[in-house]
Amino acid sequence: CGGGGGNSGTGSAAGGTGRGPITFVTGKDNSNVWAPTVAKWNAAHADQKVTVKEQSDQADQQHDDIVQHMQAKDAGYDIVTVDVVWTAEFAAKNWLVPLKGDFALDTSKLLKPPVVAATYHGTLYAAPFASDGGMLYYRKDLVPNPPKTLDEMWSMCSIAKQHNMNCYAGQFQKYEGLTVNAAEAINTQGGQIVDGSGKVTVDSPEARKGLQMLADHYKNGDIPQEAITYQEEQGRAAFESGKLLFLRNWPYVYNLATTDGSSVVKDKFAVAPLPGVTGPGASSLGGHSEGISVYSKYKATALDFLKFIEEDAQQKFFMEQGSLAPVVGSIYADATLVAKYPYLPTLLTSIQNAVPRPVTPFYPAVTKAIEDNSYAAIKGDKSVDQAIKDMSAAISAASGG
């Protein structure tokens, strides 16, 4: 396991291509996937041990922690966990080693959407290790055939009324989850918040239609009043307690709704792709990748660790231990796993139809513009027309730097 010395190259970005102990920075390891993964690596790499540094479980705090350490050119953060929406910002600031040339990664066996999400201006900057896509959880005892279109789903709200339940919820509190849900509504109608070149394109009839749908169904009660306070966990609790017919949420809910002692829907629910206009809707793409800091002294070790977490065995472990969506496509066809996790084919459909949230180096300000205006429109504090105009103006202002 040779390699250049830690001082090879010129300047911090090119230097540190050798091997040695590294620190891996990630959000709070709630599902206990990293301790065993790192233990397995360390058992085989005595002189290149990986130490895990856990951050908080709040995405904005994780983001700010990485920013702080990168601005300080801290060599102690060798590998950082990058939420799909941070790629552009970290790449534009030259904080991540481009994964090309000597640092190239083979992405041929990976699903395309997570690779695209880890790419900025045509260059891969991080190694995808877990993807994520939204799914529609539904009560199969009350809805034998899941809705394929939005119109079908909303028409089924009469079933909820018959059973004194609420119909539909997603994540509508004013936080990142609302950007996810608003973007799904807009993209599913054929709208786009920001185009591929970074131009703001949200001021369109399609975007208005998407946001209007959420506002209308909140107003008429199909989306219950309390759903404006829901993040992921509040929606899960409502669904598990039998109060909701439909819930838009991430795959992690599946195992919990099946095993939680308090869940009254254990054998009564199933999942389907998010409904769209004529077929599957456009989920917002979730997930994380791992980037190598340009300030790391041991980039060769970091690259090997990135390759290790993309191996099939590790990807299966992440799936089974943490309900993390694999980035290796073939795993979704693994008969043993599908028998154990029946939602895998639905999740694959979701990821394949997923749309990244706006790709921009100014993401924190852009998502705030989306959240604030979507929230105001759904609550009825602003007309949808005004909310879209204000959103467009605020995103343009943020993108101007």
Q: What role is predicted for each listed range?
A:
Residues A43, Q212, K219-D222, T258-S323, ...:
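Extracytoplasmic/periplasmic substrate-recognition and gating elements
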Residues T349-G401:
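Conserved C-terminal helix/tail region of periplasmic/extracytoplasmic solute-binding proteins
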Residues V84-G133, N145, E152-W154, N164, ...:
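Hinge/lid segment of periplasmic solute-binding proteins
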Residues A117-A118, F269-A272, E320-A369:
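Long, aromatic- and glycine/proline-rich binding clefts that accommodate carbohydrate-like moieties
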Residues K100-L110, F172, G191-K209, T259-V264, ...:
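Short, solvent-exposed loop/beta-turn-alpha elements that line the ligand-binding surface or hinge
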Residues M156-C157, K199-I228:
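Glycine-centered hinge/linker elements that transmit conformational signals in sensory
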Residues C1-A88, S263, G276-T278, A300-T301, ...:
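Conserved N-terminal structural module of periplasmic/extracytoplasmic solute-binding proteins
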Residues Q55-I66, V85, D151-E152, E226-E240:
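Short helix-initiation/N-cap motifs at beta->coil->alpha
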